[in-house]
């Protein structure tokens, strides 16, 4: 599997704060940016507004980040880190359907925490070629992770052997990002309904209709 994109490799970030109060301020800036990016988008959110939402002076922002763009990179890096920590290893005796539902729910819960960053990134990359290139790398990485999951599930009893696994991984990854984008206008019940629908769709793309009771070893 390809390595996770390193969005900060060329960034000159201020050092990680050592004092607890400074770490708390950095966290407040991140939370404020996520909220404002979600509410107003990237261009309509200013550094001054981020600092104000965090109840901090504008100068404090520059002690932690050199620009709004750098903060966006940090937030997306945080999202990728959280995504990389999602384990695909199933517990013994769990059904593939249950595993899929649990994985999708955990992944979606993680992604929703960074919805503001995702929406800001999608906007910013329209006028920032480097962010657009980074987005291609992100998508290649997330598609590879989906492919790894499908490869694992394909080994389970009852799995179909006649489907094209790579194109299916790309379709599922595209579906996941699309659901995240649309979730901003959904209620919690609607989000769970979409997760259930995605689980059903993916499961029946991989497993025969008679495989429902099979368990992973």
Where are these regions (language model features)?
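Amphipathic alpha-helical packing segments from all-alpha helical-bundle domains
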Residues: 81-84, 109-113, 129-155, 166-170, ...
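Short, hydrophobic secondary-structure boundary micro-motifs
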Residues: 118-121, 133-134, 162, 188, ...
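N-terminal intrinsically disordered/low-complexity leader segments
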Residues: 1-24, 210-217
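Solvent-exposed, amphipathic alpha-helical segments
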Residues: 28, 32-40, 82-90, 171-182
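Generic hydrophobic, amphipathic alpha-helix propensity
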Residues: 22-34, 50-51, 71, 75-83, ...
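Hydrophobic alpha-helical connector segments
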Residues: 74, 88-116, 165-172, 195
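Helix-turn-helix
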Residues: 28, 36-70, 74
């Amino acid at each position: 599997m390809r390595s996770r994109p390193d969005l900060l490799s060329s960034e000159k970030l201020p050092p990680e704060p050592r004092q607890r109060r400074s770490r708390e301020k950095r966290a407040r800036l991140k939370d404020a940016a996520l909220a404002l990016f979600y509410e107003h988008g990237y261009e309509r959110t200013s550094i001054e507004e981020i600092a104000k939402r965090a109840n901090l002076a504008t100068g404090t922002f520059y002690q932690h980040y050199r620009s709004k763009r750098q903060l966006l990179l940090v937030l997306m890096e945080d999202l990728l880190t959280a995504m990389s920590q999602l384990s695909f290893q199933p517990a013994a005796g769990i059904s593939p359907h249950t595993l899929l539902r649990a994985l999708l729910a955990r992944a979606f819960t993680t992604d929703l925490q960074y919805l503001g960053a995702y929406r800001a990134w999608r906007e910013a990359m329209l006028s920032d070629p480097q962010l657009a290139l980074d987005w291609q790398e992100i998508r290649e990485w997330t598609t590879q992770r989906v492919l790894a999951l499908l490869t694992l599930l394909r080994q389970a009893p009852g799995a179909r052997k006649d489907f094209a696994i790579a194109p299916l991984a790309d379709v599922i990854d595209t579906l996941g990002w699309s659901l995240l984008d649309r979730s901003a206008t959904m209620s919690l019940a609607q989000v769970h309904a979409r997760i259930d629908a995605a689980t059903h769709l993916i499961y029946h793309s991989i497993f025969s209709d008679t495989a429902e009771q099979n368990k992973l070893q």
